[in-house]
Amino acid sequence: MRVMDKLVIKGGNTLHGKVDINGAKNAAVAIIPSAIMASEGICTIDNISDIEDVNCLERIIKSLGCDVSCSSDAIIIDSTKLNSYNANTEDVRKMRASYYLIGALLGRFKKARVELPGGCPIGARPIDQHIKGFEALGAEVTIDHGVIYVEADRLIGTNIFFDVVSVGATINVMLAATLAEGTTVLENVAKEPHIVDVANFLNSMGADIKGAGTDIIRISGVKKLTGCSYSVIPDQIEAGTYMIATAACGGEVIVNNVIPKHLESISAKLIEMGAEVEENGDSVLVRCKGNLKGVNVKTLPYPGFPTDVQQPMSSLLCISQGDSIVNESIWENRFKHVDELSKMGANIKAKGRTAYIKGVEKLQGSVVKATDLRAGAALVIAGLVAEGVTEILDIEHIDRGYPHIEDKFKKLGADIKRVTI
């Protein structure tokens, strides 16, 4: 029988102290599949978070023939014995980022067979732009009974203009193009920090990628990739979550091991609401002493406000003064936290891609469910500020992206514990 945990939170404490941010989940789950493209040498990747998505990928690449070992915050991958292009385990179906195996295996073997992935249920998350890119490089793509088959005699560099800005497609096609013949030019690409991180990792293995983080990425194909040592960037989303939690609870917290530039859109909103945010090297201090005012938020591709922080921000807006409007422009079904927040007394209603919020003075503790990763983070923040006790169920979603969340908040003064059901 599977062991299930829940989080039990007694709200009302202010937060004080320091919190260290781990390596970026969104970077790690793309870099680990990228590592299997190395036909020589060993990849040592550090600043890796102890989260379920990383553990899941470790099991997947082992099933493909890689030798994998882990230390406290590093993963060592020897993919020289990679012997399968067929990724069809239960773990593949469990997580969205397993689709990066398609681009990686296509680059390495010129073929891939991958179960269509899962992850958080936040609406239709099509891979049509991935397929467009693979086909443009010369691959034939078929989907049958939940399995995607991709195969090419040769991958030939070309110009690809994505119809929509897609983080996943940008990375996946970049992976395949790295080992293609000739030059590939990707336009209308996503610019998120973890895309730059993946490109830097590939370049460390011997790739020739220029322009990641700009409007156009140029990839000159190489014949092989070689293992390297690399450190993953800090997690922008984890950092933003702790910043928002501090603003919600009040107090003063230094968020360490961050790249402040990656947090500018979050910092700007918190300052607009009345919180204080100070940058200092690789840390950000958040201070909040009084009531915050509601603001309007629209999620946008980087450098805009991150969709992954929309749900935690919604919890903060629920206890801010006045009205707020949250427009989710990236995903069409990312408001599953709304019903759970309503159980806690929030005045929040969702219609289409927009949530309308009227701030209330207090939230009340309740029993709620984490329907997805970032909704779970939103409920933790709501529980931290609510009167009474909040129990959060289905926290396996939270464990996919937030390492030791209860320990980190406890060190900041929160009354939070993990309980086995």
From Swiss-Prot:
* In-chain residues carrying the UniProt-annotated modification 2-(S-cysteinyl)pyruvic acid O-phosphothioketal: C120
* Molecular function terms, GO-annotated: UDP-N-acetylglucosamine 1-carboxyvinyltransferase activity
Q: Where does phosphoenolpyruvate bind?
A: K25, N26
Compartment(s): Cytoplasm
Query: Keywords assigned by UniProt?
Result: Cell cycle, Cell division, Cell shape, Cell wall biogenesis/degradation, Cytoplasm, Peptidoglycan synthesis, Pyruvate, Transferase
Residues at which UDP-N-acetyl-alpha-D-glucosamine binds: R96, R125, P126, I127, D128, Q129, D308, I330
Listed EC numbers: 2.5.1.7
The name under which this protein is listed is: UDP-N-acetylglucosamine 1-carboxyvinyltransferase 1
